Amino acid sequence: MTESKRPRVMVDMSATLIHHGHIRLLKKAAEIGEVVVALTSDEEVKKTKGYVPELNFEERKEILEGIKYVSEVVSCPWLITEDFMKSQHCDLLVHGADNSNHIPAEKLIIFPRTEGISSSMLRERVLDSLIEMNLDDPKHSRASDKVARFLIESIKKEFRIDQKRTSLSPYGRGRQGRPQQES
């Protein structure tokens, strides 16, 4: 008697700042089959999202390879095609609810996003923390103040944040920088 082969499941992501939502998605995918992460390159992220990832491709790849649910990490284009899936010998594509890939429904599994977390939200939390640290704690040295101000200004420029704002909304931004709809 032969054991039936588990499907190879592709999970595409940019994972610019890896968080527990990514881990949960990978865990769910691993329940279905062998997980192949299709990771977008730094160039694809810059071209599509408009910024350079905080962690470069090799750093993101190394982190993902260290996750027990992941069998393999491959570089991928922004949009996954059936041909790309075939080239990686994958049977299914798993994606979050923000899917824009053009894969037939029978080969696509959509999982809802993890509430309350996204890479964009992490960026906002870092910025808010830097602002709070810089404004509220007089113990910080001039050097740390300079670093904090530099980082704040860099983040504001990179993400085109209104220069007059001193705090950010707790809500993330959707694909292509559009605010997400609240439900």
Residue ranges and their predicted role:
Residues 1-129:
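Nucleotidyltransferase catalytic core that binds NTPs
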Residues 21, 59, 139, 143, ...:
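A generic structural signal for residues located within well-ordered alpha-helices
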Residues 132-141, 154, 160:
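Nucleotide/phosphate-binding catalytic cleft detector across ATP-hydrolyzing
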